[in-house]
Amino acid sequence: MKFLALALTILLAAGTQAFPMQADAPSQLEHVKAALSMYIAQVKLTAQRSIDLLDDTEYKEYKMQLTQSLDNLQQYADATSQSLAPYSEAFGTQLTDATAAVRAEVMKDVEELRSQLEPKRAELKEVLDKHIDEYRKKLEPLIKEHIELRRTEMEAFRAKMEPIVEELRAKVAINVEETKTKLMPIVEIVRAKLTERLEELRTLAAPYAEEYKEQMIKAVGEVREKVSPLSEDFKGQVGPAAEQAKQKLLAFYETISQAMKA
């Protein structure tokens, strides 16, 4: 039991001495605090697991004391971290104030470098423009020569193509006439065949047409024969009635004339 307690004590002591604090910079101090907190938490967890292995009947009181000691150690670490916070902020302020002069010197050097480099930049631009102009002068004749060569080649190609195009145009006209000459017999054959078929149809339809014509003439004659008596009868009936109506109208007119004179 004493050996276990001694081992825990040595472990905790080693843990507290494992990360010496350095005051190099605020970031370093923060790293130390974070590492110390993490290490203490791991030590507490390991020790608690070891304590849990002890028999509650025999070591109950001792387990409670060790657990309390671990809690006190955690609280001490938290209090230490909080107590270091003002020193960390103060150190950061001191560091900022201490480096103000250095930062001012750096900014001054940057401005001086900018002032010194501005003419150099103009000189560099001038040199680059000069080199580009030299390259342009070297390349421009070659480019012009290439363009002229292509233009000459195009002119030569056009000169070669013009007579061929004219020849093809003349051949097209001749070929059209030749095609027409070959096509006309085919057209005449088709036309003759169509004419023949039409004549055959006309020949086949002629008897039917004559028969239909004769039937129409016969029907018209029959209608005329049937209508003629009716027409004469109607005329005979209408004639006397029309004469009577005429006499009545003349008498009515005479009566009105006499009345107007009186």
From Swiss-Prot:
UniProt organism field: Oncorhynchus mykiss (Rainbow trout)
Cellular compartments per GO CC: chylomicron; extracellular space; extracellular vesicle; high-density lipoprotein particle; low-density lipoprotein particle; very-low-density lipoprotein particle
PANTHER family, per the entry: APOLIPOPROTEIN, APOLIPOPROTEIN A-I
Signal peptide location: 1-18
Principal cellular location given in the protein's record: secreted
Protein family membership: Belongs to the apolipoprotein A1/A4/E family.
Protein name: Apolipoprotein A-I-1
Start and stop residues of the Sequence repeats: 64-85, 87-107, 108-118, 119-140, 141-162, 163-184, 185-206, 207-228, 229-239, 240-262
Family matches, as Gene3D superfamilies: 1.20.5.20, Apolipoprotein (1.20.120.20)
Xref: Pfam families: Apolipoprotein
GO biological process, one term: acylglycerol homeostasis
